Amino acid sequence: MSKTKRSMRIASTTKASLPHTTRSHSWPMFKQQLVLLAAFAALASGPASAFTGMIARPVFRNMPPRSLQASTTSEELIPREVLFGNPEYAAPAISPDGKYLAFLKPDDGVLNVFVRRIGEDVDRVVTKDRVRGIRGVSWAEDSKTLLYNQDKGGDENFHLYAVDAMAAGSEAVDLTPFEGAKAQNKITNKRFPNEVLVAINNRDPTQFDMYRVDLPKALAGDALGALTLDTENPGGVVGWGTEDESFEVREALVINPADSSSTVKIRDSKEGEWRELITFPYGEEGQMIDFCADGESALLLSTIGRETTALLKVDLKTAETKEVIAAQDNCNVGGVFLDDDTKEVKGVSFNYARLEREFFDDDLKADFEKLAELGPSNAEVSIASKSRDEKTWAVSFRRDDGPTEYAIYDQTSKSLSPLFVSSPSQLSYKFAPMSDVRIVARDGLELVAYLTRSDSSKPTPLILLVHGGPWARDYWGFTPTAQWFANRGYACLQVNFRGSTGYGKSFLHKGDKQWGIGTMQHDLTDAVAWAINEGIADGDNVCIYGGSYGGYATLAGMTFTPELYKCGVDIVGPSNIKTLLDSIPPYWGPLRNDMLRKIGDVDADEDFNKAISPLYHVDKIRAPLLIGQGANDPRVKQAEADQIAFKMSEKGIPVEYVLYPDEGHGWARPDNRIDFNGRTELFLKKHLGGRAESFEPPEGATATFPLEERQDIAAKV
């Protein structure tokens, strides 16, 4: 194994929780990211990658002593503000030259970007957001410019912004200043430090063209003049990638709407003709990771000829497999760690229930062993960021019962220095453990699930927390919502039902056409039965709770298995699949047919749509329902919540409906997040009998109540 010290790149193959901010090459996200773009995406996602997971926590060993012991017992109520307020620190990113650290931190109660010199504790704010906050940041390769994405009111039309971190008082510049357009697929390159590539759909809202940005020109005030069309989308391209040496766009992922296949296309130069490298038919999963340094090979992930994704080295001309580098039988490759210059694979990760790694480089393995030695026990260590020379790392430690903690790892001296804790206020409280468990569905399929509870001495009320997507998954690790439920006296169960990602193509596609009345929902029902049979759950007090697809599953559970649930909480969940798909954003257009294949053809089969859409089964609902919705949600429109809430109200079925006019697909503003959770907590106490903190709406919350407004209008008429 090579021990040459070169810059290494971390390629994620799993869902990104925030807008993509990887420093070098964004291609590795394509296939999974596109599948998830076509979905409604989880409101709360797991770590972005086994190597880049931005979540952590711990008591470090062999470091200056610091007490992180909880000062309370599990009986004390953990305030909602502690669980759901803004983190004090998040998303550390080391500048390529290794001198500075950028991170997120509240400024006047809103998350903004700060910078400090590494080794110092003086923080300087460099952005001035006063509304929704910034949720991710990365460095340009010039080591002075910071890049971040921002939308308006949750509309998800993210623009790419840049700010000069070294110039005091510098104003952020919108690098993609097109009204109504969306920017994504950002790529930077160390050989071209003054340039950024970004895809924008300003020419055609359904197609993303690749633009090249002249950073110095943009920062000087000419953002439009700094943009040059680099590669126009010929149609069907849903993602772009580059060759590192030239920084030319030489990779494209093309979706064929007719058969839902995806094709990786490549070219030899910017002027060259595109040619097909490999096609993944519907039912197969795969993506390109990178070109190899030899110019004759590429790294791919593929399920073709196997059940789970394997990491392959393939011939660039024939796509013939030269080497199977890594694979497991029960789960996909989750992350790939590359040498940025040689493209040598230094490590890969897998995650069936817990994170595992396989190393191909002795130095990298030794570094992770050292981090495990210095960090806490029972924690998953990840690299959040690295300097270009790899001498300075920002690392995090993920465990199940405490807040994120970050440290700086000196790769030369093999020493670890505390950096910051994401939410220091959480250190004062005792959290519940999370256990990974196995549940066997009625047809014998094994499901991985995660159980969080404070009281294991007797059956307690159960909350089934359903992840979004549905083409996503839950992970082991600290989850504020699960901890909240456990602290209030409930057991919380999270299930990776069939159709979840990460477990191979058969597991994924066993969810096809199985929404609502099919086996995807049966898996959730079977999980509840398991918890009851195991003495975990009080079968008379079960709640189903979820966001996005999880919100749909809540509505489905309330309508199709009404005897099972005492109450339900639906956050931005669709109630009518046909109207959902008729109102998706235009840039999802190339993926609509793929969604029809996965969900079922609700366009052609009206009866099928009615069968799986909870809106048509409102009469079956027996239990109270709480609905939360963002008015600006571009994925699940407000109408999805309106129509079922109004129909339930008309029929006298108990329903509460809270609408936030300044939110989208979930709650970005802490005041709204805390507000809705406060209302949820009182709802759960009323119907399940758990504990609740007193509730006063936060001053900045914007909750409105459409059912009450409708009744007021009706009364006046």
Task: Describe these PLM feature segments.
Residues 84-90, 108-113, 121, 128-135, ...:
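Peripheral, non-catalytic segments that deliver or gate enzyme domains
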Residues 497-717:
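Active-site-proximal cap/loop segments of hydrolase catalytic domains
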Residues 486-496, 656:
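A fold-wide structural signal in alpha/beta-hydrolase
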Residues 1-4, 8-21, 30-55:
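N-terminal chloroplast transit peptides
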Residues 75-107:
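Mature N-terminal segment immediately following signal peptide/propeptide cleavage
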Residues 465-468, 484, 494:
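Structural cue for short, hydrophobic secondary-structure segments
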Residues 58-79, 99:
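N-terminal organelle-targeting presequences
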